[in-house]
From Swiss-Prot:
Species lineage: Eukaryota, Metazoa, Chordata, Craniata, Vertebrata
Protein name from the UniProt record: Bone morphogenetic protein 2
Pro-sequence residue ranges: 1-239
Subcellular localization: Secreted
Disulfide bonds: C253-C318, C282-C350, C286-C352
Subunit composition and interactions: Homodimer; disulfide-linked.
PROSITE patterns, sorted: TGF_BETA_1, TGF_BETA_2
Location (main, coarse): secreted
Originating gene: BMP2
GO molecular function (one): cytokine activity
Biased composition (Basic residues): 231-248
Glycosylation sites recorded in the entry for this protein: N91, N121, N157, N295
Function per UniProt: Negatively regulates the structure and function of the limb apical ectodermal ridge.
Family that this chain belongs to: Belongs to the TGF-beta family.
Keyword annotations of the record: Chondrogenesis, Cleavage on pair of basic residues, Cytokine, Developmental protein, Differentiation, Disulfide bond, Glycoprotein, Growth factor, Osteogenesis, Secreted
Length: 353
């Protein structure tokens, strides 16, 4: 057939890679998409950079992590004595059917602006209650019917993300097809006697808060799932190279450096991290007799032996014998931030096969 032009080959290569990533088309995210700090922390953890976050538990059975911001048409719920409540709805329809969700967390940041009403040396606490809405409020019943999912006691000075397990609700919506009416997040303010006080806590965007600071602190729903391909996300143990002193032929089969730069293929607008990675490749001769370090099979040894007396039979080939995964943080077609483990992306060892 006719030779393909380089740009056609590149387009075909891009389509194959997108298919490998489970994407139907190349994502084209807007310039103002914000990557939640939690997702960056999770990526750093799984890329082997140590962190002091308890992120390991939820991700240990998952190979895909997705984050969702709530739909910002916030429904105010009537404030009762000493309580602040908000409804948060997260649209989860972009989770693929083949993905099995194993757990879900609701991340809330009751940040510094929340606590300005309190004296710095006082010992006030808030209780944060997370409810699933079973039936939304109606004209006749002003309050929604809810079910408590999680509750936690938070000191008013604690400026950190609070994570609540909302797995039962998300599984009901996704796996069992129940209607998703969202969550109610209720903050109960407790004074020194642990009775409810009327101090106000903000869990939604303030009137004058700029887009950038709000986007860093807005609530986040994080789902952990597995698409049935490859291994779960986990901290990658750095392999210790086995340095045995052995005589190697200069041209014998071995691993060579190969760095894949996502900038070169113009993908750095939707791949958040890493900017590229060391894929390596295998190249070199498989000479007769095959040395032990060439990591050969019995079949390769027999084939090489036959080749030494009959050159019509090809030599064994230098190929990857061990491959490892990489973690990638990227924006999908719906501008959702996804962390995923991709199998067989890095050559760890080569041999004659």
């Amino acid at each position: 057939g006719s030779l393909k032009r380089p740009e056609d080959l590149l387009g075909e290569f891009e389509l194959r890679l997108l298919h490998m990533f489970g994407l139907k088309r190349r994502p084209s995210p807007g310039k103002d998409v914000v990557i939640p700090p939690y997702m960056l922390d999770l990526y750093r953890l799984h890329a082997g950079q140590q962190l002091g976050y308890p992120l390991e538990r939820a991700a240990c059975r998952a190979n895909t992590v997705c984050s969702f911001h709530h739909e910002e048409v916030l429904e105010e719920l009537p404030e009762t004595s000493g309580k602040t409540a908000r409804r948060f709805f997260f649209n989860l329809t972009s989770i693929p059917n083949e993905e099995s969700v194993t757990s879900a967390e609701l991340q809330i940041f009751p940040g510094e602006q929340v606590h300005e009403a309190f004296e710095s040396n006082s010992s006030y606490h808030h209780r944060i209650n997370i409810y699933e809405i079973m039936k939304p409020a109606t004209a006749t019943s002003k309050d929604p019917v809810t079910r408590l999912l999680d509750t936690r006691l938070v000191h008013h000075n604690a400026s950190k993300w609070e994570s609540s397990d909302v797995t039962p609700a998300v599984l009901r919506w996704i796996a069992h097809g129940q209607p998703n009416h969202g969550f109610v997040v209720e903050v109960v303010h407790l004074d020194k006697e642990n009775s409810a006080s009327k101090r106000h806590v903000r869990i939604s965007r303030s009137l004058h808060q700029d887009e950038d600071s709000w986007s860093q602190l807005r609530p986040l729903l994080v789902t952990f799932g597995h698409d049935g391909k490859g291994h779960p996300l986990h901290k990658r143990e750095k392999r210790q190279a086995k340095h045995k002193q052995r005589k190697r032929h200069k041209y014998s089969c071995k691993r060579h450096p190969l760095y894949v730069d996502f900038n070169d293929v113009g993908w750095n607008d939707w791949i958040v991290a890493p900017p590229g990675y060391s894929a390596f490749y295998c190249h070199g001769e498989c000479p007769f007799p095959l040395a032990d370090h060439l990591n050969s099979t019995n079949h390769a040894i027999v084939q090489t032996l036959v080749n030494s007396v009959n050159s019509k039979i090809p030599k064994a080939c230098c190929v990857p014998t061990e491959l490892s995964a990489i973690s990638m943080l990227y924006l999908d077609e719906n501008e959702k931030v996804v962390l995923k483990n991709y199998q067989d992306m890095v050559v760890e060892g080569c041999g004659c096969r």
